[in-house]
């Protein structure tokens, strides 16, 4: 799963919502990286100090998934992804944010 983000406008969309094998923020061009503070809408998350990761709010991911998040299968997959992220140290201390790497290539943001 990945979030397509235009850092100039803040527009963002969740893609491949049922692929729980990867998580990333995909921006249009390499010129957009590293991300500057303030380029990610606060409703989506926050830019990590390195500008190459974004902590995306888990509740926002659920909201962006829309009706897919209502299914037991989606929730189980998301919970498993969160558990893996937790074991890997990729959650904020309060568990509200999931660390996503930033890339320009959607193929690196999926299990493909």
Describe the role of every protein-language-model region.
Residues 2-54:
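Short helix/strand-capping turn motifs
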Residues 5, 23-26, 58-60, 81, ...:
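Generic signature of intrinsically disordered, low-complexity segments enriched in small/polar residues
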Residues 9, 21, 29, 39, ...:
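Residue-identity detector for threonine
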Residues 34-41, 45, 58, 62, ...:
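Generic detector of well-ordered alpha-helical segments enriched in charged/polar residues
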Residues 48-68:
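Short glycine-rich, basic-tinged beta-strand/loop micro-motifs
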Residues 64-112:
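Short, compact, well-ordered microdomains
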């Amino acid at each position: 799963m990945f979030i397509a983000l235009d850092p100039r406008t803040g527009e963002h969309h969740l893609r491949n919502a049922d692929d729980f094998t990867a998580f990333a923020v995909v921006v249009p061009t390499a010129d957009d990286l590293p991300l500057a503070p303030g380029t990610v809408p606060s409703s989506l998350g926050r830019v990590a100090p390195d500008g190459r990761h974004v902590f995306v709010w888990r509740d926002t991911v659920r909201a962006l998934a829309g009706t897919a998040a209502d299914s037991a299968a989606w929730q189980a997959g998301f919970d498993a992804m969160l558990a893996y992220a937790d074991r890997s140290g990729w959650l904020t201390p309060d568990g509200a944010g999931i660390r996503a790497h930033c890339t320009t290539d959607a193929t690196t943001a999926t299990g493909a």
